[in-house]
């Protein structure tokens, strides 16, 4: 199953996007442009969580903040959105569904 992050807007160090699971939009994303992962495909493994409940870009490192887009550089409802996403991922893992994270910058606007 594919979990996809489509990066849409880059403004200073903030990179906004959206997260899709098998093509269905689940939530918005926020990353630190200076430290975010390179575009590509990554198998999701249990040893490390890529998803964060942070509402700003500072201290994110390579993690991806999930939530609802409020304005450039800021998300809201990060904790409940992260918990819903992680619960869904745990259910898929329990059913032994292979998961891959795809990060795309196709069509990203730089402001």
Can you say where each PLM-predicted feature lies in the sequence?
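Cell wall/extracellular polymer interaction/catalysis modules
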Residues: 1-111
């Amino acid at each position: 199953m594919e979990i996809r992050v489509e990066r849409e807007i880059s403004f200073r160090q903030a990179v906004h996007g959206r997260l899709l699971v098998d093509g269905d939009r689940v939530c918005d994303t926020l990353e630190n442009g200076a430290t975010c992962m390179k575009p590509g495909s990554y198998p999701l493994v249990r040893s490390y969580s890529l998803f964060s409940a942070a509402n700003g870009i500072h201290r994110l490192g390579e993690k991806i903040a999930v939530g609802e887009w409020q304005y450039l550089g800021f998300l809201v409802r990060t904790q409940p959105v992260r918990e819903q996403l992680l619960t869904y991922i745990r259910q898929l893992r329990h059913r032994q569904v292979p998961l891959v994270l795809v990060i795309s910058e196709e069509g990203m606007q730089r402001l």
